Amino acid sequence: MERKEKDHLNLVVIGHVDSGKSTTTGHLIYKLGGIDERTLAKLEEKALELNKASFKYAFVLDNLKAEQERGITINCALRQFDTPSRSYTIIDAPGHKDFIKNMITGTSQADAAVLIIAAKKGEFEDGFSREGSTKDHALLAYTMGIKQAIVAINKMDTIDYDEERFNEIVENVSDHLGKIGYKKENVKYIPISGFDGDNMLEQSENLPWYKGPTLTEALDEFKVPKRPIKKPLRVPIQDVYKIAGIGTVPVGRVETGVLKRGMEVQFTTGATSEVKSLEAHHNKLEEAEPGLNVGFNVRLEAKEIKAGHVCGDAKNDPPKNAESFIAQVIVMNHPGHIKAGYQPVLDIHTAHVATKFKTLLSKNEARTGKLIEEAPKFLKNGESGIVELVPTKPLCVEEFSKYAALGRFVIRDMKRTVAVGVIQEVIHKKETKKKASKR
């Protein structure tokens, strides 16, 4: 019962490929008792078999066979661990450029971020270059609503715990995070070794010059966001499982409202069903409040629900598909001009859908929203505008002012983040309700 009492926080761990995200996260989970010695010994054996001895902690999270062989995190791995005062769900997001889509899904579910940066000469520079993913990840996290972060400067053991190098990295990173919009007081910088465990739970003797908090102390200083319990239910679906003996189990994070056992829920397709049971981290629940990642059993065929769909209360403002929507976008990284007819991929909550720029309504000042030009011919890097977007597949989105997590998005093309935006108005499709299929 103790877990119920604790504040719960969702953390996303982000950073460039090979910065040591999975190792740091795995080691932290081990130190906090989230995995036993026997399991770790098995993982160590497996790592040795694959000639990757230094990956034993990473394997705590890298559970897909393909990931263990390549040593890269592909899906967003979810794990739970506890400190004496808090309960955390940790989302280890992929750092590899090809897997940025999965990273966005992970980030959209988090309350706070831990950005892991490798201190090693060349590695920091690689991650922070135009081709590296560190800057992209930090921007995506901010756009997805994460306003508090820890920057863990990792692999300090490889640079002899050099204070000067630490300060040089802090200066570079804090300057960049400030430009994105992060407030200085909401970001902490901590020197660590994810493999050796320096500064994770207790102050390290190898870092006598560092007087700040350890990684776990800094985690416990994160503010727990106010949970929007009173709003209608919204659960963006991350995965759908078909489990023998149970049936269809969609999994997602409750963003607003309360999901209850026995409630009649409706998905964006119009399909409805009663919630037969729900659980989080193998604990059965009667209800789940915002911030909780849950799996719940519904009497629907697995093919009727997909990742990216949204679940709501059938009797209270159920989620609907958007015909089109009006949004403010800021163009960040497009090699040319964005014009009407452009069709990139839109990433919003857990959905990734090709979306067309139907009309460019205006060009505006990014900070103030002041009108610069009506019906512009194009938008280019650094410019902001109001546009009408049309999704090419069924998609549930909401106004940012009503449901923040379902109202902010990232636009991707050519494996890069082209633009970010927030939704101001949604034009809905007229839908008919479909009853749960008979079992």
From Swiss-Prot:
MF-aspect GO terms: GTP binding; GTPase activity; translation elongation factor activity
Annotated GTP binding sites: 15-22, 92-96, 154-157
Alphabetic keyword roster: Cytoplasm, Elongation factor, GTP-binding, Nucleotide-binding, Protein biosynthesis
SUPFAM superfamilies to which the protein is assigned, alphabetical: EF-Tu/eEF-1alpha/eIF2-gamma C-terminal domain, P-loop containing nucleoside triphosphate hydrolases, Translation proteins
Gene Ontology cellular-component annotations: cytoplasm
Residues covered by region (G2): 71-75
Region (G3): 92-95
Family annotation (PANTHER family): TRANSLATION FACTOR
Name this protein carries in UniProt: Elongation factor 1-alpha 2
